[in-house]
A protein has these predicted regions:
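Positively charged n-region of N-terminal signal peptides that target proteins for export
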Residues: 1-4
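A short acidic/glycine-rich loop-to-helix N-cap element
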Residues: 135-141
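Bacterial N-terminal signal peptides
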Residues: 6-14
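GNAT-family acyltransferases
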Residues: 17-134, 145-173
Length: 173
């Protein structure tokens, strides 16, 4: 049943078309920094540190992505490099936006934030996860609060959904 719900959710929020998600005349926010972490666009150069975070956090990622089975236990570093290259291209093409959450010294990836095109209603769907050790340290609600405020303040969306989060919808006023 959860798989069916996830598929329906993807039909509603996933942008599959070739058009830009955010028009070219709008400047794309490039992230922000707090006292605890930095959020910035993910690149292929992040592959090894991102891979370590992903593999530490498979269960949390499956929950954050509403039952999606990515990544599998057999996910490889090379597959991660290819995945990040695709995410980097989609960012440049303005089709979707993936941000890495890193420690301030950039030594450790703490999580990831995905901003995807909405369909049939919401302008955007935002998914996020933090690595297991950061989750255990209480980073998840801190990240969620900071991301919600940043999206509301910096992005050109009127209706944003946060699937799987306690307050799933935010409408800008």
């Amino acid at each position: 049943m959860r798989g069916v719900a996830y598929c329906l959710l993807l039909l509603i929020v996933a942008g599959c078309g070739s058009s830009e998600f955010v028009p070219g005349d709008i400047e794309i926010p490039t992230g922000f920094e707090t006292a605890n972490f930095r959020l910035r666009p993910i690149t292929v150069a992040d592959a090894e540190k991102d891979y370590a975070a992903v593999m530490e956090s498979i269960g949390l990622i499956h929950t954050a992505l509403l039952g999606d089975r990515w990544p599998t236990d057999s996910f490889t570093l090379e597959q991660n490099r290819k995945d990040l290259a695709k995410k980097e291209r989609r960012f440049e093409q303005r089709k979707s936006f993936t941000f890495t959450v890193v420690s301030l010294d950039e030594d450790r990836v703490l999580g990831c934030v995905y901003i995807n095109k909405g369909r049939r209603g919401p302008d955007a769907a935002v998914f996020m996860w933090v690595r297991q050790s950061s989750y255990d340290d209480g980073l998840d609600p801190v990240l969620e609060s900071a991301v919600r405020e940043w999206v509301k303040r910096e992005w050109p969306f009127e209706w944003v959904v946060y699937p799987g989060r306690t307050a799933p919808e935010v409408s800008a006023e």
